[in-house]
Amino acid sequence: MFNILYAFGWLFTLLPLRVLYFFSDLFYPIVYYIIRYRKSVVRTNLEKSFPDKTQKELRKIERRFYRFFCDLFLETLYEINISEAEIKRRFSFVNIEGLLEQHAGGKGILIMTAHYGNWEWGMNFPLFIAEDIVSCQIYKGLSNKQFDRFMYNLRAKYGGINVEKRELLRTMIKYKSGNDQGIYWMISDQTPAAQKIHYWTEFLHQDTPTLTGTEQLARKFDYAVFYAEIKRIKRGYYQCELIPITLKSAQTTEFEITEKYMRMLQKTIEDEPEYWLWSHRRWKYTRN
């Protein structure tokens, strides 16, 4: 079944993106009004995150989120056949020079991003740097083996190295011993497992458990840390600004990096909330 769906998807993505957006407009009312995909989760998340907004304002954000969600799904499929030239035309970086300056000075780099905008297109970062620079993205395997293979290959399409979470420390030690300490993309807005919650913060008006592994590694190896803020410029076009969180991680206090990241992400979401993945059960744990 997966092979059939993949073949259909592959043929589908031969169409121009503007045609795929026509289908996205058709899918939106089906997903929003009929399937109602995770609507209760989305609605609850929005209501708790923006307690000062009216129901009318919240529903407007909700509808915009689902429209973007349909676009995002087809943009991800479109990546199967997208060319290097088109990726570079549709996705751009700001301050990549500042990041590469730190890397050239011998620093390893950790990039903290989120499920915001088109983060999958951001994984094509290796296209924007020299081929000999080690660029890794942390990859969590999916339960469906065939879909897992599809996403694994898609993310590695343009030279990025997929690193399983359990192999991350070993990989970082390996590259630290060489001339290139590497650049690592981390999707850092996920919910940690209950037994691995070490830090809570107020995020979008709610007590929120946070991942702290990126900070721990940054402080251990004294890597520079950047926040990748992805903005949607217009339909099908994105800009990612690489904002320094710290260039001297070893000098930071415990949870300082995590807290700065969460504040930056909150500002991004508050500015344009419809582009965050509201269907994720981000607040499934409560603080005792």
Where are these regions (language model features)?
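Catalytic core of membrane glycerolipid acyltransferases/transacylases, capturing the structured
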Residues: 105-166, 193-202
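Non-catalytic C-terminal accessory region of glycerolipid acyltransferases
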Residues: 60-63, 128, 153, 166-288
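Residues that cap or flank secondary-structure elements
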Residues: 34, 90-91, 142-143, 164, ...
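Membrane-anchoring hydrophobic helices of lipid-metabolizing enzymes
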Residues: 1-113, 118, 153, 159
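Residue-level recognition of alpha-helix initiation/capping sites
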Residues: 37, 93, 117, 145-146, ...
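A broad structural signal for alpha-helix termini and local helix breaks/kinks
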Residues: 15, 34, 49-51, 130, ...
